[in-house]
Design a protein with these regions (language model features):
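Bacterial lipoprotein signal-peptidase II cleavage site
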Residues: 17-24
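C-terminal motif of bacterial Sec signal peptides marking the signal peptidase cleavage site
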Residues: 12-15
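Active-site-adjacent helix/loop patches that line small-molecule binding or acyl-intermediate pockets
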Residues: 100-105, 109-114, 224-329
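Short glycine/serine- and small hydrophobic-enriched flexible loop segments
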Residues: 194-202, 247, 251, 300-307, ...
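Active-site SXXK
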Residues: 181-211, 429
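N-terminal export and membrane-targeting signals
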Residues: 1-6
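Second-shell loop/turn segments in exported
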Residues: 71-74, 173-184, 218-225, 232-236, ...
């Protein structure tokens, strides 16, 4: 997602089905099968909200067959591309064409009680097969059993109309819904940091030890050798999404024998789509589509990080899953870093306070860490250029979250908690989509020289605001 200056981009080689001309979303579609079971009110609201946003109206700066599409080719280490790549897409924006098919979306809202326990959830999947979105039933353990999850496929999303080929969870061949998971981009760093903090709790890592990161070979994604404390790497990974720090943490997990146990832990907890696989033990890079996360399992992971008393849900083996999976100290550190997120520009857009674009999102407090004397936000040399103090005065919630993007991923996952006297809602929201930096709104303005460019369609901000408005009313 972000390199040292916060401006990186990646790509995927795009192919187009011969049956669907570029610039048109096919109107021909057999009625999709609906999953079995009841869905919650929050799921129904989320589906209706996503449908009303008309995500299919975004423009594609690298449509199939274009020179821009041909220049985006590597589905591995997508975050490793340069500012030149992103500038190329921005330059192509005036000639962008309508997206050729319904975008891919995986969204979950997990409602919490005042003690942090999940009480209801809504998951909606949208794809070329489910153009209006489909609400997914879950069981009492907040598990979606009637979905066949597939790995993201950069070429196949266009060529196969969103149909994946590699299964993520075994034994789901007869599931009603078949859905290709979006590549999670930098939201994968939630799994990485969870794994490192698990090692710290087990005494296999000390947070204040200096870890000498010596990659061999050096990866364009990860950069060269560094020597920092584990605590510092965690801070940089979560607050401003440093790829270098995150690669160091992945390499640390490999060196301390933490990767396989982490993936097994996710399986044991019933978080079957959370898989940190295929990374390179020599440098912590090689981030690819074998790294998977669904919005529902990500929300459940965040529920554990947030903390709740007693059993949060029951694992497949019948054992209770509790917040004791991390120590109180590790959860506090994790939450603190998520609460200092610098990039508040997808579901929440307070970094862009006061402008006509993008639309306002979740009305969060922008962390003071990034606010300069003039009220503008600068995150590791990424300058947003707007005074956020008026939005902070009107803020209603704290949003402890992690964002991510590459050219064909937009992702945001976090915990929303109302400020005192501001409505009392507490919930977790996670959104994954393929509408990354490659896709733009027709009304997107240009940014002044030296200002961080817009990363997402403003439709995600409208989604965040609509979800928060619904949750505020629910708690009245």
């Amino acid at each position: 997602m972000y390199a040292s200056a916060g401006l990186v981009l990646s790509g995927s080689l795009l192919a187009c089905s011969a049956e669907t001309p570029a610039g048109k979303v096919s109107a021909v579609q057999a009625a999709p099968k609906l999953p079995k079971g009841k869905v919650s009110p929050v799921a129904k609201n989320l589906r209706a909200t996503l449908d009303k946003l008309r995500l299919q109206e975004v423009l594609d700066t690298a449509p199939p067959g274009s020179a821009q599409a041909r220049s985006l080719g590597n589905p591995v280490d997508k975050e490793a591309q340069t500012t030149t790549d992103r500038a190329r897409l921005l330059a192509a924006a005036p000639a962008a064409k309508p997206i050729v098919q319904q975008p891919q979306v995986d969204a979950t809202v997990l409602e919490l009680d005042r003690r942090g326990r999940p009480v209801s959830s809504g998951t909606v999947l949208m794809s070329p097969a489910y153009k209006n979105g489909v609400a997914i039933p879950v069981d009492r353990n907040f598990t979606a059993k009637d979905v066949r999850w597939r790995q993201w496929d950069d070429k196949g999303w266009y060529a196969n109309k969103g149909q994946g080929t590699i299964d993520v969870v075994p034994g789901r061949e007869k599931a009603t819904v078949d859905h290709m998971l979006n590549y999670p981009a930098s939201v994968l760093k939630l799994m990485v940091n969870f794994g490192v903090l698990r090692l710290a709790d087990q005494g296999k890592v000390k947070l204040d030890e200096t870890f000498d990161y010596k990659p061999d070979p050096v990866s364009p994604l990860c950069g060269g050798a560094t020597a920092k404390t584990v605590r510092q790497y965690i801070d940089e990974s979560l607050t401003w999404s440093s790829n270098g720090a995150s690669c160091a943490l992945v390499k640390l997990l490999h060196e301390r024998g933490g990767i396989d146990p982490l993936n097994q832990t996710f399986q044991d907890f019933g978080l079957q789509t959370l898989q940190l696989k295929g990374t390179n033990p020599a440098n912590g890079g090689r981030w690819s589509n074998s790294i998977t996360m669904s919005s529902l399992d990500t929300a459940k992971l965040l529920a554990l990080v947030n903390g709740a008393p007693g059993k949060v849900w029951t694992a497949p083996n019948g054992k209770p899953v509790t917040s004791k999976v991390l120590s109180p100290a590790s959860r506090k550190l994790f939450m603190s870093k998520l609460g200092q997120q610098g990039y508040n520009d997808m579901l929440s857009t307070t970094n862009w306070c006061g402008g006509t674009y993008p639309a306002p999102g979740i009305p969060q407090v922008t962390p003071s860490r990034w606010i300069g004397k003039d009220g503008t936000v600068t995150v590791n040399a990424s300058k947003f250029g707007r005074d956020v103090r008026p939005c902070n005065k009107k803020a209603e919630v704290r949003f402890s979250h992690k964002t991510g993007w590459v050219n064909n991923t937009a992702s945001d996952a976090g915990i929303v908690r109302a400020l005192p006297g501001k409505g009392g809602r507490t919930y977790i929201v996670v959104v994954f989509s393929n509408l990354g930096t490659q896709y733009v709104d027709a009304n997107r303005p240009s940014t002044p020289p030296g200002i961080y460019p817009f990363s997402y369609t403003e439709k995600f901000a409208k989604l965040g605001r609509a979800i928060d408005t619904y949750e505020k009313k629910r708690r009245r």
